[in-house]
Amino acid sequence: MATKLQDGNTPCLAATPSEPRPTVLVFDSGVGGVSVYDEIRHLLPDLHYIYAFDNVAFPYGEKSEAFIVERVVAIVTAVQERYPLALAVVACNTASTVSLPALREKFDFPVVGVVPAIKPAARLTANGIVGLLATRGTVKRSYTHELIARFANECQIEMLGSAEMVELAEAKLHGEDVSLDALKRILRPWLRMKEPPDTVVLGCTHFPLLQEELLQVLPEGTRLVDSGAAIARRTAWLLEHEAPDAKSADANIAFCMAMTPGAEQLLPVLQRYGFETLEKLAVLG
């Protein structure tokens, strides 16, 4: 099968047809959402997957809530018009905290969001100190503070918001080395603590991609917790019980919002995850 880059107007050679499978969209502002997709694919390998990333507005962490809601709804709408969806996963903590109500109101298929894994982290911590590593947007939003009040009110929560770590994760996917010195600088507030967090919530879907490097920088024995496996289980349940019969026999496909050199350079990465085709998605608005 040939590798394919499409600008949204050029027809491409489809992969060898297969049996129709439920179509699931995984969406993120960048390509960090592949960490969630990988967990879902591990549990549910026989689905028709679409991965969409918004390389025009990336990163979302610094955008307004109104902008994010409008943008995410427009992108999911554009995908749904191309491929009827059985389910959509918003594999972006920032987008999930603000856009899920609008998505669920507009669409009949289930929409799964990603929220920081504060509840399991509160159960796992031994010293009662939990770190939340996320974008600044996620750290600031009331939804995050409500999760903490509900599930971790007996824990000491230390929050760090970083847009730079998102960029480091994207760079790693492009094949660049991750600077441990940069991570140490970002994590300095924790590393200087007399008793730092023993459990760290990776509150951005980009951050599991940096797990290896984080474990080299954080104190030995630190647990890293993310939502990927829980999202996969939730996806499986919803597909069985609530999803519409929306299937496709097409090959998995990835969509970007602009066919830039940076997007084109991601094709080998996307191919490793099972997406042979990268195409520009036309989005209104």
Language-model features: where?
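Non-catalytic structural scaffold of enzyme domains
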Residues: 2-285
